[in-house]
Amino acid sequence: MAQIKFVIKDKFDSNDPIFKSLVDTISNYNNVNKLKLIINITYNEGGEVAIMLAFVATIEKAVLNNSNLTIELRFGGFAMSAAAFVFCYFVFYADIPRVRVLSNTRLSVIYHKPRMKQKKSSNFIFANDPIKMKTLAKQQQTELISYTNQFDDVWGAVVAIYEMGGEAFDPSLLSSYNGNGDFAFTLSNRVFKGGY
């Protein structure tokens, strides 16, 4: 089986050529020979939600349309914001074949609602702040609400899986997330999903 490795550095950024290279690799893949894409996502602070969601959609579409393709997402160090979404999406939310998620080191996951930076300001705006939402253009408002709904759906899956284990989810953690705070947890290195 051939392998191709990619490294997503620091954050999901529209200026990072890795995303074009990944899309080109998948687009040119003919599904004849077995191929494994190894994507390293380490010490990632998040970045652009739109780029991250396009990355997630690319992985989903590629694996569902190519039976000889497997994808291994290797996390390490920390995964914040958009990177935390990718981790939680593939581990807790999506049931997609041939996607393996693992960490070779301890992993700190910091998950929070998506936000948009207000133009000409350093303020971040969350969708559940109606006053600040009005300062965004209509298109930005629509995007932020859509992003928030997707993040909330994945967060709901994280909570549901935890509670299926017989534990009650700490209400203060739910309040923190719903109040635009961070939810952080640290995991030991292991394979989280997909043993092939």
Set out the residue ranges of the language-model regions.
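N-terminal organellar transit peptides
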Residues: 1-196
